[in-house]
Amino acid sequence: MTKAASGDTKSTLYCSFCGKSQHEVRKLIAGPTVFICDECVELCMDIIREEHKIAFVKSKDGVPTPREICEVLDDYVIGQGHAKKVLAVAVHNHYKRLNHASKNNDVELAKSNILLVGPTGTGKTLLAQTLARIIDVPFTMADATTLTEAGYVGEDVENIVLKLLQAADYNVERAQRGIVYIDEIDKISRKSDNPSITRDVSGEGVQQALLKIMEGTVASVPPQGGRKHPQQEFLQVDTTNILFICGGAFAGLEKIISARGAAKSIGFGAKVTDPEERRTGEILRNVEPDDLQRFGLIPEFIGRLPVVATLEDLDEAALVKILTEPKNAFVKQYQRLFEMENIGLTFTEDALHQVAKKAIARKTGARGLRSIMEGILLETMFELPTYEGVEEVVVNAEVVEGRAQPLLIYAEKKGGAASA
């Protein structure tokens, strides 16, 4: 496909897919009456690679290896190698257990539900969301803070099973092979160590209600959701083979662990370590069932979660990688927003490190990166549609610190830069 360029005797060739001219791209590949540019070829390769990675879940035996699952998680989640391995092995074994159950073997394989423990902003929820994209079984996420005991205002525990059923398009057989991720599980901890005469309907009561569906029971689920009533028809869902993954920040758990460690380290030969010098993730690695019980989880609930994986604090280097490397990295997102106005956006290396330092100081982990970026670029994005002749916006460390405005580079002044 060719178009004559106005004022030019030679014909200019254009990409048949994106419409860019041969002068706007590095290469233009010709075919019979059509052309494709190098940028479109790259985009097609990305799509093919992504589909190839996701295709592993439909292999001939239907069991992806833990390494394959980890490789896909690596594309979206930076660091947390131990937690990735725990999840990958759990999902791999979940597939194997389902295949094993269909063969009517004498040995019954029990499921190993997982508890993810880690500071806020370390990637617990993102790991679960990424798993949902790559696995070939129904997957749903639930928020523990919305759950209450049956009969009280709030969501019934059985609504989790309903969400899984909806994810399986109401195919009961598929739903019974699914995976459930319950977020903010630490928010349903018992309010105090001592039994109370008042009912704890959103804490211990929810833990009691979750016990049965996590271990395995036949749940009666109303097809349309909501509260049950006698005239209603119910769908029967067996939760025995549903894998449950629970995650929470468990703020304050590190103090319980440190206190236990301090009690053991008494005497002249004891090694004295200042708790302030140890990072939260490092302390959480030493978590034991007794610590979780002191935090407020009941022993029966802890027993239903035999696998405990802890996530590490994210250091400066990891936060810089999170800003730039994942497919949906924050820097890439803002660059795309600026591209829509035909303006480039560049963050200098020192600016990225300064953003990471700010997030560490706020103790918000990766979750705090977006709000910091938003604050830095707010004024620039407000004026962005009105900029004329601006080719690029550059953010350096001084801008992040609030001591300067982003630098504006104008098309006619490529050698110089003017302050916004």
Curated annotation (Swiss-Prot):
Ranges where the ClpX-type ZB domain occurs: 3-56
Family matches, as InterPro entries: AAA+_ATPase, ATP-dep_Clp_protease_ClpX, ATPase_AAA_core, Clp_ATPase_C, Clp_protease_ATP-bd_su_ClpX, ClpX_bact, P-loop_NTPase, Znf_CppX_C4
Superkingdom to which the source organism belongs: Bacteria
Molecular functions (GO terms): ATP binding; ATP hydrolysis activity; ATP-dependent protein folding chaperone; protein dimerization activity; unfolded protein binding; zinc ion binding
Binding site for Zn(2+): C15, C18, C37, C40
Keywords: ATP-binding, Chaperone, Metal-binding, Nucleotide-binding, Zinc
SMART domains the UniProt entry points to: AAA (SM00382), ClpB_D2-small (SM01086), zf-C4_ClpX (SM00994)
Record-linked CDD domains: RecA-like_ClpX
Region (Required for interaction of SocA with this protein and degradation of SocB by ClpXP): 1-62
Ligand binding (ATP): P119, T120, G121, T122, G123, K124, T125, L126
Biological process, per Gene Ontology: cell division; proteolysis involved in protein catabolic process
Family label: Belongs to the ClpX chaperone family.
Notes on the domains: The N-terminal domain (residues 1-62) is required for interaction with SocA and targeting of SocB for degradation by ClpXP.
The protein's name: ATP-dependent Clp protease ATP-binding subunit ClpX
Originating species: Caulobacter vibrioides (strain NA1000 / CB15N)
